[in-house]
Amino acid sequence: EIASLPYSLPLLMHAPQGDGHPGLLLPGFMGSEGSLIALEVFLRNRGYAVQTWGLGRNVGFRPGHASALEQKIRYMHHESGRKVSLVGWSLGGVFALYGAHQASECVRNVVTLGSPVTVDAEGNAVPSLLKALYRLVAHPMGTAAHSMQPRTKTLRDRKQLPMPMSCLYSLSDGVVPPQE
């Protein structure tokens, strides 16, 4: 993807200017905040006030991440007086959905980039690779082990978000099931 950036620049330079509202960028699985630098620079050049999540490398939800993410969203909203756009890449998109559910009054919209957003209690709608990675970083019993935890229940119940949501993905990425 990064190799195609020079060829994409002419098109990207015609992207509309932003209105200066805040945006929170969430990295993908095992991605650091540095993995978002190209997106951050692009969005800043387009006029958005973006920040990264401030939690370092994304190794999955860890104790305190849920409350830290919610606090960050609320702080950005309070500081700017404007609702925050959440942009999450891969697993960061799942975190963005969680944050949107927890602080919906502070969120303008959610954009997920190659994020697996369909999760059921048995993990049936989750690709095998993602299940394996989840077992590696989260719990040896897989996605079902966390199905009764409040954060998982929030995503599984799929309450309608009161803000717009855009999901961008590739049919060949191996992370997002085509039926989504």
Language-model features, listed with the residues they occupy:
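Short glycine-rich, acidic/polar surface loops and turns
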Residues: 173-180
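Short boundary motifs at domain starts and secondary-structure transition points
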Residues: 10-18
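Membrane-anchoring hydrophobic helices of lipid-metabolizing enzymes
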Residues: 1-7
